[in-house]
Amino acid sequence: MRASQYFIPTLKEAPAEAEVPSHIYLIRAGFIRQLAAGLYEYLPLGFRVLKKIEGIIRKYMDDAGALEVLLPILAPAELWQETGRWDVYGKELFRVEDRKGRFFALGPTHEETITDLVRKNIRSYKDLPKNFYQIQTKFRDEARPRYGLIRGREFIMKDAYSFDISEEMAVKSYEIMKEAYKKIFDELGLDYLMVEADVGAIGGKYSHEFVVKVPNGEAHIVFCDNCGYAANVEAAKYEFELDKLPPEDEKPLEKVHTPGVSSVEDVSRFLDINQKKIVKTLVYILDDGTAVAVLIRGDRELNETKLINYFKALDCHLASSEELKDLGIVEGFVGPMGLDIPVYADISVKDLHNFVVGANEEDYHYINVNIPRDFKPVDFVDFSTAREGDPCPVCKKPLNETTGLEVGHIFLLGTKYSEALKAYFVDKDGREKPIVMGCYGIGVSRLMAAAVEQSHDENGIIWPENIAPFKLHILALNIKDDQIKTVAEDIYTKAKEKGIEVLFDDRDISPGAKFKDADLIGIPYRIVVGRGVKNGKVEIQTRKDGKKEEIDINEIDNFLDRL
């Protein structure tokens, strides 16, 4: 492809709204343009990258036995109401009304639609298993679209759905897809982690995320270098047995005056006691209005995702000052004793002795509190946020933390959707049973951004070879020089004949502008045709490591054959 005939609108400066490297460089290098907040146009270079990513995904989906389909973007509200997700998704779900007053969802996912297709067309165990996938535009009404392709209101996804006759068979389908995902991300050339994850609004029994490691990513991951355990912080566990304090003999309960002292740090200083022996009592309001108290050790943070999952809630929030007042609870001095709401405790509190809690009276705390002598929680639950240094739940070695971008997510759904939508099959004994499902997503457009976040420098993008828009970039530094033009044209012709995807910069612009654009665009290999042709030389450059090498023109064939 000749640059003079292509469309590469590069920019010297990034737009003011571009904050992260992928947003900055994809716009500056002419891969995308913004139409509105969270909406992007894919220009020729960007579209080529998308097609490369989609091609790799299709290859391994097909190899895994998945069948490609294309489902409508719009889904009737009735389908989403059958599963209850019309309300669960809340404001993030785009809802549209047609001229007849009928409501539809602009699909962020397609569980309802694909399950409806299956329930209408598959009735016998002989028709199972099946696995369908599509690459389709999705929609999510983000409150604050940001970071370019990372968090948009419109995005491209590959979503797949497996249908099996039993959980045992569904697990096999899940494992097949998990292995296919590993192959996809390996071939994409990305540094990623497969991590245990929360099932979220999709629901299901368990799930894994595929996270590309990047600084300041939205996904927070804890992982173990020793055994390979990795989990999203929302789902991560730690070995709490190794985080206990030594046992103590119980001391008499005592109420102490703590004027104006309410935070863990202040109580620790005032009473001269380790923060691990101070227990926070947090009052939460669940989405149905239920108030619950949750105890957690003073040095640990509560994981609201675990809380929501335990109570099977849609959402929760910390009680406000007004809500605490309505409950008759004294803000700043909340404790478990004497509360009129259910009290639950994190596992960090289970074997704690002689600890401190609020006395539910202004300016007072209890010390030397012990369970079950002084109160008894309804249940002990893992509500803690795992963090760096915690013992690994598998091998007990210290955990590490990193950040990244979620680019893939797989779920073993079980029968959540098939039961809600009455997608049943008849087994070999003539009994009707719900189909067991799995679902598997990959953010195609987000992968483009993730690759740039992980692979760039101060000059621009450094594309992994398998998804680069072109493999070779030929720069003719002075296209008006007949010798330079002749050599560059000859190399361009040879590269095309060898089946190499090549971009030939034949524009009549300065060498400096060509080099800047080449660095911005980030094509893996570069042949620079300049003044060296007078000595029978051209320069070979590698974008990834910046390595430069001058070779004889008659060695070009050998170089091209190695690409």
Curated annotation (Swiss-Prot):
It is an enzyme of class 6 (ligase). It is found in: Cytoplasm. Its EC number is 6.1.1.15. It catalyses: tRNA(Pro) + L-proline + ATP = L-prolyl-tRNA(Pro) + AMP + diphosphate. GO terms for molecular function: aminoacyl-tRNA deacylase activity; ATP binding; proline-tRNA ligase activity. Transmembrane segments: none annotated. One of its GO terms (cellular component) is cytosol. Belongs to the class-II aminoacyl-tRNA synthetase family. ProS type 1 subfamily. Catalyzes the attachment of proline to tRNA(Pro) in a two-step reaction: proline is first activated by ATP to form Pro-AMP and then transferred to the acceptor end of tRNA(Pro). As ProRS can inadvertently accommodate and process non-cognate amino acids such as alanine and cysteine, to avoid such errors it has two additional distinct editing activities against alanine. One activity is designated as 'pretransfer' editing and involves the tRNA(Pro)-independent hydrolysis of activated Ala-AMP. This is Proline--tRNA ligase.
